[in-house]
Curated annotation (Swiss-Prot):
SMART domains: TBOX
Encoding gene per record: tbx-31
Extent of Polar residues compositional bias: 332-358
Pfam families, A to Z: T-box
Native organism taxonomy: Eukaryota, Metazoa, Ecdysozoa, Nematoda, Chromadorea
Region listing for Disordered, in residue ranges: 268-289, 332-364
Disulfide bridge partners, by residue number: none
GO MF annotations in UniProt: DNA-binding transcription factor activity, RNA polymerase II-specific; RNA polymerase II cis-regulatory region sequence-specific DNA binding
Alphabetic keyword roster: DNA-binding, Nucleus, Transcription, Transcription regulation
BP GO annotations: cell fate specification; positive regulation of DNA-templated transcription; regulation of transcription by RNA polymerase II
UniProt organism field: Caenorhabditis elegans
Superkingdom of this protein's organism: Eukaryota
Name recorded for this polypeptide: Putative T-box protein 31
Compartments where found: Nucleus
CC terms in the record's Gene Ontology section: chromatin; nucleus
Amino acid sequence: MTSQYSNYSCPLNNIQVNVIGSSRTSDDHFLEQMLTKRKKTNISQDLHYLLLGLNPRELYQISFKLARIDEKKYKFNGNFNEGDYYPHKNSEIPMEDTEEIVHSDGYQTGARWMKTGVYFPKIGISKEQPDKERCLLLESLHAYFPVLVFTTSSGISLEVPVWSQKFVTTMTSSNRSVKRREKRKLEETAGPAAKKTPDIIETTPEDVVPEVYNAQYFYQMQNNTVISSESKFSSPLALQQDLTEDFGTFAQLDAHFNVSVQSCSSSSLSSPAALKHDSTVSSDSDFDDKNSEEFDAVFEYIDQQFSNHDQNPMDQQSKSIDLNQTTWAPQSINNPGYLSTASSPAALNQDSSASEKSSIVRDKKSDENCLDEFDRVFNELDQQFTPKEDQVQDLSNCTTWNQEPINNSIQSNQFINPELFYFIFHKCLIISWPSCLSCCRGSILPQHLRTPPLVPISQLLIISPLVLPPYHNFTTGSATVSPFASTPANMTIFNFTSDSSTTYSNSTTAQVFPDVANTPDLSYFNIAPAVDLSLFIDPFVQSGRDLSIERSIRNFTNTLKKAHRQKKTAILTFQSTEPMQLEFKYCTKMLLRTDKPVGNFSIQLSGPYLEHLLNLSHHLCRFSEYNLFVKAHFPRGSYGSLTSMTGPAVEIPETQENITIIWVKKDFPENVNKYPVAINSLITEAIASNGTNQVLLTSKYPSDCTIRFRKCGFMIEGVLVVKKKETVIIDRQILGELNRLKHDLLQ
């Protein structure tokens, strides 16, 4: 399987399917019930799925079908509250999958499927040969589960089972089968005229209920309560007598569970003493239906409280938030008055119906609740990792460093909740390879995330100038190249040339230079090697042009592989009939953006970057389509193309120690249009040589600015102030501490 899809940057076998609005897992053996009849009936399940792990640039067609779980025929176990089924005998019908129903949207990109999910509405089932479209033939009393079939544009298909959805098909009603059986007997004795007789056929409960309702076992399993084995559990009175034998009176039972049933408006349930009095004056013979319903309501409510208390704390909290918007909220069992909200058994029944309605609302708003849960988790992380005022150090006088690192509190022992960390990784689609792997040592991560990158994380440089509106004008800065006259650096250098400071030229080039000493006036951007070079097209681009660009991306990927095998340089060139706007991003943080459109653009890659792009791209693209991408805004009515080629090899030396820079923010004066702009970003150089212990930061800025060091994914305010066109010397050890602890937890 792996070798079959090894040519793809994101293989098909990494696809994950989650059911939206369902809390069940693949280990849950509970089988939902679906009714089948001769005509078409819609599936009672909500066929809405969330997809992960698709290749964002690959075209997929998704189909739906049902498959048999096993070769067994199932039977109802008599548990009406849970509706569970169990294998009864081997089925004579061979195991065959149903026909596939293709999604009406046809072929769509993986980014679109992962963003919106896939939904199959109005799919019907029938127990006879269906005569309508979008209807599947199923056999009664057999277990099925959904299967999603993914087909790529190249014809490769993969089936992904959805084990969290399992159901058994049953007939419409057992009463009808009994009536048909009785009518058949009448036809044999009285003749065909018996069909027209309107006599009502009486059926006994034994004919309707497949098995005896084992309420004793159900109550014992749900509440973990020891009940006398001699009890038949034939009525709530017998249940009460058994509880009285084990725990004493109802008052003692209340003390045992730390629950007190407070005043009820009904005379029969006014107090626990009244409950005891009713039990002493009643018997099996004179126990009426009214008291039976009241006891059932009380114990059903108690069961709900126990079941809500045993749930996952995170699920319980989200559930309590939703239910607070309705009529009642589940509370702790240790609260003595958690039953005081119901003044009567009728109120208990109303609360039960209200909880069912709220569960429906909760299922419909699952996406909103999920987003609220994300906000809550990241707010907690923000409060935990944001440094306090006494932890923020002044780095203006930074020639010496003898203090502890700022906010040096992110250690591996703080990630004590693997589920939460895994939750953040997969639900929020962390984009880049997390540098916190060095801190967490990969012990709490899933197996497919524990593979370390090919380069040390300390060598990854993330440069993140804050993208400001067009009126925030900057000028490019010049690098100090004297320390590098004999020491070349392994950097990807983007050289953006323009004929003036206010207008753009028709061409823009970007190349890899082996020696920075030969480029005295350039803007330096060191891209982390462990990223995937991909092209992302704006959503407003029409589908016709999108398909041509998709093919060009695949050709460029093949060019990268060819250049890597032949040890050559790959050149990526953009061409368009009209100028287009380009954006360079890394991990959704802007590296560079052109304010005005440019005509052509090319990137030259070689050396170890090709190896890192090819070997590590599959680790990153399984989380999101945004890694390192070039965003091309094609004007409406124009067409763009992407070409690639290979060139001669360019040797690049080993990477030096890199430094993390920084976000820049400035409150501009009112008259902001007087500064001409060439590129809408601040170019800040952080260059360190092997012979010095200091780093020079030079900023060509129209006014004073504040540079913030980004550490642990959060900002440290006001750590360094750079004056207008000033060069600041920063001790290397300070930057080393910041670089060692940086975490790319994107918000």
